[in-house]
């Protein structure tokens, strides 16, 4: 095929990584939902009643297990009580009384993503949706699978439209009633307890209406009915004020009081003691007011069950009690009562049993027998029915898998023959129950249930080896293809031709045809065909351009001839891999607080200029010192806590640094740029004044952002909500600061320092508005370090070029033709040099700084580590997509800054456009492939969430780098470096004569080649490498 150019390569990189990023969801997180199963319930004697006639489910959205049971100072003492009294009390006395005297309790462990939709689906359907379902709860997406609500005779529900609507629309028409409040009252900055009191009041209204409505009264008195109270107040309060705040703790008191009132109301209405109550939460809440990832604070929720059919508390006399060994509940004061932990999906099975319903057909929850008060026979029958439901799901999934594959290998423990057959297992358990033996059937049902889950797991992962092999070859093929393309475009300058043979064409075509035939027979989705096509395309291209790899090796490593040369090259390779592995080590640490590897790297990096000798440091003392200071300051941010508390003083310090930096540049711009003139435009007094006016407006926006942010924070902290005027001004500053830079086109100043200052001031207001702590300080230090890096890399480039010219006679580089090439940028033709091994260091530095831009203010686990408090200054009501967009905007700002700096560095080092970006994309997938094999879909919830984030961040990094390349083109279009750098090139020429210039052009070429190239080109000295007016 035709050789891809720069933009073709970048486009291919984006498409490939976007498609392959989705591969983990086709491999690790395939939806477990199947259809066509029959339902199972407990088979009772005719006339026998279910454990309860009705079920009441309370879900306290966002309630952490520890906060529900821990004692704490009263956050809202009653009138007449001492407000200064800090004696701890139990915030949920009614719930606690159920634990102590009436029911069974434990901790319900959720899975990632710890969001409302997946949590409620697990609770009510017994199903763990695949991870990609996280955002489906942000809009109406009916649950297209069975649930406890769907199995009920009728369900009444009250609460948030985000949860209730999806269960109502997904159930049998008319089976679920949903009474929902409007989304506009979900205001994170106001008193969220009103969301819960609204629900409690609506429940009271329903039962009050039944007294005068015989039809409603009759419906309420039927059996197998469910009442669902979704209590969103705690989640909203936790986001706005965090779970250790007085507001959150007060909300717990409100919920407890409301639950008591509703429980009493229902008991009095029916008067038959035939109601079962379940109190739990869909997910927890982290200390920084977020959820979504697998942190234990997000995955551990309370579970308290009481009422009809529920076992009472199990006390022991001075003996250790099972369930408290982990120490998590040590300060709850419940050590004398047995704690029964469950998986969240188990709650669905428990509710179905208590209400006398069939188990939801997609449920993987195991009935927790410790929670039920029943005879041994009833428990044995319930355990059997629960197991039959899961086995039915296994039977249907296996039949589907068997029909789709060319050759199917059955799951041996449940193979359809002899003693292992499902029917044989069920028959044996039924015989034992009929003979009056119950303990053994319960054990066997539990073992068979676990085997059935293993069988489902076997079917779920059946295609893993096949798919992971394809994906692995795809990533390895991309790495090889990318390196080949970089060598072809930027080392050989397209002088090597592709060469295919008949044999190779037949070989690769045959593999593709065989692969597609298998996929077609198995009726695979279209993504599988794309997954398979990429590795074949990449490896075929690498084979066809194998001569480019050989020629590139001779140019890049041809100078390594002696033993000492091999030792030096090996040492450089070890150092390169060590830094890359250090980044990998950072990701492999399964914790939120171990970012110190970046601190170590920055400290070591501060000594980097010394590697070029004392003479270099002496010539660039200020630059080297600034770099050391920048690295030292950057190293401190990864030592600061990830969990940040809103601190207006820290926000102010960062904003003032931004403001005074812009003001200083505005006042002394002529002095700073006095040695520079734009080669493309010589601004006069009017244009200079216009440029200063626009920049002055940018500086003013920084100050206005600080003022409105301080005002908004004060109002929000005082619980007065967000004033409308503040919201308007905040949005005005955000939008205006991003629009103002475009007016600089009217009065252009093309110096690269001026361009970087414009970018710095462009994003400063956004960073101020969306920061809650030290992020503004980080932004200032990060920008300072990047500018220093660009100048330092250029200084090293000039210094090493001058040194190689001085010692040209001893140059060990083999004599190769000087492959100087040209490119048209901004309508002008520029010459550029080919890449060398030293440029991989630049790519590695960029790679490291790119990651530090994210991890210096947060953790890798998920965006949930970034507080929502800053977003409330612009959007105080629940709007997940808009709020997430603002958080992502804040995360992307440092990346935009670094892209501009690398684009400038690309030109200062006189390499072709995109050359350095392409090198970065070539090496980044070493990390991506590492994380691909680290992805887990089982184990601890923290592990699952963290590994998903690892892979996606690494995978999108390459895509993001491609996007940054295009962004940098916009930012540095027409940029000029002034005559100072031209003077540097001239000084090299003056020092070493005519050879210096071409050495700078092509540091890999020997002096004779440089001279020949110069003569052939008809150019002199540094003019051989004209770029933006001849600058180096």
Curated annotation (Swiss-Prot):
Membrane topology reported for the UniProt record: Multi-pass membrane protein
GO-annotated biological processes: cell wall organization; GPI anchor biosynthetic process
Superkingdom of this protein's organism: Eukaryota
InterPro entries in the cross-refs: Alkaline_phosphatase_core_sf (IPR017850), GPI_EtnP_transferase_1 (IPR007070), GPI_EtnP_transferase_1_C (IPR017852), Phosphodiest/P_Trfase (IPR002591), PIGN_N (IPR037671)
Spans within the Lumenal topological domain: 28-468, 522-523, 586-596, 644-647, 710-722, 788-841, 906-914, 973-1032
SUPFAM superfamilies, alphabetized: Alkaline phosphatase-like
Signal peptide: none
Glycosylation sites: 150, 435, 810, 820
Span list, region Disordered: 994-1032
An example Gene Ontology CC term for this record: endoplasmic reticulum membrane
Keywords per UniProt: Cell wall biogenesis/degradation, Endoplasmic reticulum, Glycoprotein, GPI-anchor biosynthesis, Membrane, Transferase, Transmembrane, Transmembrane helix
Entry-linked Pfam families: Phosphodiest, PigN
Transmembrane segments: 7-27, 469-489, 501-521, 524-544, 565-585, 597-617, 623-643, 648-668, 689-709, 723-743, 767-787, 842-862, 885-905, 915-935, 952-972
Main localization of the protein described in the UniProt heading: endoplasmic reticulum
Topology, Cytoplasmic side: 1-6, 490-500, 545-564, 618-622, 669-688, 744-766, 863-884, 936-951
Gene3D superfamilies xrefs: Alkaline Phosphatase, subunit A (3.40.720.10)
Function in brief: Ethanolamine phosphate transferase involved in glycosylphosphatidylinositol-anchor biosynthesis. Transfers ethanolamine phosphate to the first alpha-1,4-linked mannose of the glycosylphosphatidylinositol precursor of GPI-anchor.
Record protein name field: GPI ethanolamine phosphate transferase 1
Taxonomic lineage: Eukaryota, Fungi, Dikarya, Ascomycota, Pezizomycotina
Underlying gene: mcd4
